[in-house]
Amino acid sequence: MNALKAILYYFSIVIAIIFLGLPYAYFHCYRKRDWSDYTRICCYFFPWLFPKFGIDVEVEGKENIPDKDGFVIVSNHQSFLDINVIFAAVSHTAFVAKSTLWKVPYFGWVLDRTGSIPVYRSDPKKNAGMGKKIAERTAKGYNFCVFPEGKRAGDGVMFRFQNGIF
């Protein structure tokens, strides 16, 4: 049953991308030439979707998140839902993510348009200046999420942090 639920969950996301995400991208972002809030639609969609699949999300400490200043979330990557929860809780979120994700259709396009920054695992020299890019963009109000372990830790055990931005 859990596998079927997961398939339906992701199918719902695909349908939402087609009927909400792409029109929002065109009518709001493309025409205004402003992609900074492309992820804002997620702040409404995921809180609506989670209860439909029995997903209970509790956000603690949201009062500590600045309203206007950019900030960086450093999080343990525990499950496939982490990114969805972050999108639901925090608008204008970009990610520091492995560069191979930019090759995934649509997903890579969204990462690029939202100001996300790629981490090059195969060529660490390309990562030079990443901290400066993050600092510049947070000064402009961007929010970033970093999963410093570099992969999901499904059992809750923390992996050693990768030295991409640290």
Task: Tell me what each language-model feature is.
Residues M1-E58, W109-V110:
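A transmembrane-helix-recognition feature enriched in membrane-embedded lipid enzymes
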Residues D56-F166:
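Soluble catalytic domains of membrane acyltransferases
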